[in-house]
Amino acid sequence: MNISARILKIFGWTLNFTIPDYPKCIICVAPHTSNWDFILGELAIHSVGRKAGFLMKSSWFFFPLGLFFKAIGGVPVKRGKKGGSLVETLVRKFNSVATLTLAITPEGTRKRVVNWHTGFLRFAYETGVPVALGAIDYPSRHIEVSEIFEPTGDINADLAAIKNYYRGYTGKYPDKFTVGPS
């Protein structure tokens, strides 16, 4: 058992991380209601001996913290910028490397939002990489990364199916998470 797995165990967290070790993969992670989600995600991925990059708002990438986040796989994102340029950049990045796993929070914020971002799905359509569904459930202290979502190309149907998957999970701050109406 490595140090990350031990830390999770000491704090009473369980982990079910059973997805195959794909050379390239997106891990869609929800609910995202606290900065602790990042720490738990890092512990989870490292406890199974893997690495994952992650998207994070650019305001976190100030010196010296920015050096740390970039060293562990952080990709700064300028919030509010629309138009697909991030998706295009990530597609080029994925196409230029042999291996890359990227964790993405579709809510794009820790605040309560009904409309999730769809860039990760557009990215999956363009690259053909698998989309793993990762969930952090605070009441049960359980992290689940065991489902692979097969995108159909219908962005609305795909997003509805993904949101439905997360219905049974509760974030650290439950009032900050919703998948929308039933």
Where are these regions (language model features)?
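Soluble catalytic domains of membrane acyltransferases
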Residues: 1, 9-168, 173, 180-182
